[in-house]
From Swiss-Prot:
The modification Phosphothreonine is found at T199. CDD domains: ASKHA_NBD_HSP70_DnaK-like. This is Chaperone protein DnaK. Pfam families: HSP70. Keywords: ATP-binding, Chaperone, Nucleotide-binding, Phosphoprotein, Stress response. Belongs to the heat shock protein 70 family. Acts as a chaperone. Residues 600-635 are annotated as: Disordered. The keyword Nucleotide-binding applies. Signal peptide: none annotated. The gene is dnaK. GO terms for molecular function: ATP binding; ATP-dependent protein folding chaperone; unfolded protein binding.
Length: 635
């Protein structure tokens, strides 16, 4: 069995880890970083950039640079949270034909899983470069409070990226695995507070150790899938925009370029204020009007930032109370508090969490890497590389069906350990009813339409009978990924209908297959582009070295030979301006052939001088390889 990699697909940053022997290793990407910005950009010349290269060009290409896509994955366009984002994001969020939230980039409609797949492809490539083998399987993490549609959309993203998603695992649970695996923790109850770039989760987890086997059992989970660092950034951006408007009378919200610069500066200032008491946000030439250029220079203190975001931090405390209540525990029974997610580096967050639990959070868990490490551990469990670890996760929200009077009747309660299966018998609401509609719901509200609709199907062919007589057995079966399978069976006739819930929204099989094909086509285009760049680099070096030799020993050549070399140089120079790799390679070969006379002229006699030239030639070869690698990294 091949390696199963662990991927933390984050809102702001993503990370990939593997089991390497007995150790878990977080891998560096082609830019040398252990985390990759979850940013995708589509350039004017048709190139797709992912990670740091995409982030670097965001200011000049705001409408085609996509970030925080995880906040849209598996969501409906009309969702309140999506509408909120649609008003502030520089890129265009649209309604798909099925009502999902999609994006429009350069007049092309794209689904969030399709875009997230680009990040997953980079994670896959990072692992392949390190291991030197093809990777096809992964464990991918999601916020614990993700619903069924969001989980399914994440699996779709994996498929589009060319990965078989062996397991979807909750982020706080993954962090608990990272924390508990290499420590002699004994039996402990821990709280994992996970405040990332776009989502917030709290999980109460019990770690038991019996005869060397560790069991990680999630007792309760809660959260908010639309609360994270992006919201903190927005508060800072709004403050800076308002201050600038007061000073200059100019509203930067109408200038996408200025807003992109401001977003970058706000995020940087927020990070700086975790270690400094104040910082300057200084953006010269932020905009201009008839009176000339305008400069933004605003001093922000840590106290000011805290006053802007305190309400957001307080919003995270309510789910803590609910999770403890659901677990049947008091604060004093929590032995360790683990902080996960970059936003937990903020001193105010750490203080509020410490005050709530009455103890300082642990500092020995890397908030950026713990989730990917846990995912890799789960991958190791599935592949058999990791023994003596058992993970018992839960479903975050209740699952049920709509019954008479528009009521939600739960079949599986929230915080039920998964995988699980539950059946319940229902009947008809009217006499001689020949069909029933099974409307599957997820949520905690009593009124059916206040919950998330996951889908519906009909069971027909029910034998005529008075209301209340037919026996319709509805079975809910949740797999280890937290994805739901529902069946309804008429016990009298034996007729049965089954569906795997993919939500009333989501991508259908045909759309996923098309996106997989598109991704494969892009991979081929990327490979051809890399080969073209390699040929250009070789051509450039050959031009440079040949011209240098021509200057040094050209006067020793016959006029015809010199003319032939000059012509070949011009032909190669012309080919390098084009896009035809075969043409470039042909001109390289032509120049190599005619420049043989140069080599003879520069090596009139064998010996030390010739050896030195050989060494120089070898160095030139090394340079070609190194530069090709560098260009490839930038892709």
């Amino acid at each position: 069995m091949g390696k199963i990699i662990g991927i933390d697909l984050g809102t702001t940053n993503s990370c990939v880890a593997i089991i390497d022997g007995t150790q878990v290793k977080v891998l560096e990407n082609s830019e040398g970083d252990r985390t990759t910005p979850s940013i995708i950009a589509y350039t004017q010349d048709g190139e797709t950039l992912v990670g740091q290269p995409a982030k670097r060009q965001a200011v000049t290409n705001p409408k085609n640079t996509l970030f925080a896509i995880k906040r849209l994955i598996g969501r409906r366009f009309k969702d309140e949270e999506v509408q909120r984002d649609a008003n502030i994001m520089p890129y265009k969020i649209i309604a798909a034909d099925n009502g999902d939230a999609w994006l429009e980039v350069k007049d092309q409609k794209m689904a969030p899983p399709q875009i997230s797949a680009e990040v997953l492809k980079k994670m896959k490539k990072t692992a392949e470069d390190y291991l030197g083998e093809t990777i096809s399987e992964a464990v991918i993490t999601v916020p614990a409070y993700f619903n069924d549609a969001q989980r399914q959309a994440t699996k779709d993203a994996g498929r589009i990226a060319g990965l078989e998603v062996k397991r979807i695992i909750n982020e706080p649970t993954a962090a608990a695995l990272a924390y508990g695996l290499d420590k002699e923790v004994g039996n402990r109850t821990i709280a994992v507070y996970d405040l990332g770039g776009g989502t917030f989760d709290i999980s109460i987890i019990e770690i038991d150790e019996v005869d060397g086997e560790k069991t990680f059992e999630v007792l309760a989970t809660n959260g908010d899938t639309h609360l994270g660092g992006e919201d903190f950034d927005s508060r800072m951006i709004n403050y800076l925009v308002d201050e600038f408007k007061k000073e200059q009378g100019f509203d930067l919200r109408n200038d996408p370029l200025a807003m992109q610069r401001l977003k970058e500066a706000a995020e940087k200032a927020k990070i700086e204020l975790s270690s400094a008491q104040q910082t300057d946000v200084n953006l010269p030439y932020i905009t201009a009007d008839a009176t000339g250029p305008k400069h933004l220079n605003i001093k922000v203190t840590r106290a000011k930032l805290e006053s802007l975001v305190e309400e957001l931090v307080n919003r995270s405390l309510e789910p803590l109370k609910v999770a403890l209540q659901d677990a049947g525990l008091s604060v004093s029974e929590i032995q360790d508090v683990i902080l996960v997610g970059g936003q937990t580096r903020m001193p105010l967050v750490q203080k509020k969490v410490a005050d709530f639990f009455g103890k300082e959070p642990r500092k020995d868990v890397n908030p950026d890497e713990a989730v990917a490490i846990g995912a890799a551990v789960q991958g190791g469990v599935l592949s058999g590389d990791v023994k003596d670890v058992l993970l018992l996760d839960v479903t975050p929200l209740s699952l049920g069906i709509e019954t008479m009077g528009g009521v939600m009747t739960a079949l599986i309660a929230k915080n039920t350990t998964i995988p699980t299966k539950h059946s319940q018998v229902f009947s008809t609401a009217e006499d001689n009813q020949s069909a029933v509609t099974i409307h599957v719901l997820q949520g905690e509200r009593k009124r059916a339409h206040d919950n998330k609709s996951l889908g519906q199907f009909n069971l027909d062919g029910i034998q005529a009978a008075p209301r209340g007589m037919p026996q319709i057995e509805v079975t809910f079966d949740i797999d280890a990924d937290g994805i739901l399978h529902v069946s309804a069976k008429d016990k009298n006739s034996g007729r049965e209908q089954k569906i795997t819930i993919k939500a009333s929204s989501g991508l259908n099989e045909e759309e996923i297959q098309k996106m997989v094909r598109d991704a494969e086509a892009n991979a081929e285009a990327d490979r051809k582009f890399e080969e073209l760049v390699q040929a250009r680099n070789q051509g450039d070096h050959l031009l440079h070295s040949t011209r240098k030799q021509l200057e040094e020993v050209g006067d020793k050549l016959a006029a015809d030979d010199k003319t032939a070399i000059d012509d070949a140089l011009k032909a190669l120079e012309s080919a390098l301006k084009g896009e035809d790799k075969a043409e470039i390679e042909a001109k390289i070969q032509a120049l190599v052939q005619v420049s043989g006379k140069l080599l003879e002229a520069s090596q009139p006699q064998p010996g030390a001088e010739g050896a030195a030239d050989d060494a120089s030639a070898r160095r030139d070869d090394d340079v070609v390889d190194a530069e090709f690698e560098e260009v490839k990294d930038k892709k």
